[in-house]
Amino acid sequence: MLEFPKLEIPIQKITTGDVEIFLKREDLIHPDISGNKYWKLYFNVNNYLEGPGKNPLVITFGGAFSNHIASVAAFGRIFNIPTMGIIRGEELEDHFFENYTLKRAFENGMRFRFVNRADYREKELLMAELQKEFPEALIIPEGGSNLQAVEGVKFMLTEQTKDFDYLCTAVGTGGSIAGISRYAVEKQNVIGFTVVKDSGLKQKITELNGNSNFNLVDADFGGYGKISDDVVRFINNFWQEYNIPLDPVYTGKMMMKLFQIKEEGYFPKGSKVMAFHTGGLQGIEGANQLLKNKNRNTIDIRL
């Protein structure tokens, strides 16, 4: 069972002045299942483990650099439960060992099925077929975003977080912002920094949390998983100034956009803004691999 962490998650002040920005270090929650991934899995896997059948199996979905895939694989290794990843992109099948995230997931015991992008988009059909093939399996959607994940995310909110005017998180599949906006206190403004181009994202989040008490800000900076030189530069400068590592797909882009809108006057003077560091630092290795192959500057963080 995933235990409730004994660690009190630190909240670090990043900037002062007319608008104060803080970062809640959810990335420190677990060395392998970090950040929001821990809380998204918390109820999903614990409820499943209360009564698994004779053939327990956890199946989930993701792309080549998915933090969720990495976390589920680590969970399987820790609890000795088989895991399977349904991976977007059949072209990866013959050389997935060249991809840091998938290589690490495989070494943690996860087995893969690679599907083409057209079939991958039909996830509801895929999930139904998998449930028929593996009737005792726990099947978790892409990014871990379902109603049990939303319930788990409530633990990211504590007595400490109630004093902030704004709560900010990166948004991929929408589970984290659904939980944060659902369980935030009434006075708080919730902002999601979207790192994907998805016109249906707001509707998906609303379906998960039951309301639309949040705002979305575009922070994809060229597209999901696309890493510009500006993003690399920001992450390196942030590391030098605050000694806090950021990943290039989620939290790095969120913090870069957060700093931008702060300078543009988005927040009223006197605002207290808290952003959630949702982990994903395993992605730095794979990102640097791609950047090196293109002879570009890399993320200079040694964890």
Feature annotation, model-predicted:
Residues 1-303:
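PLP-dependent amino-acid enzyme catalytic core
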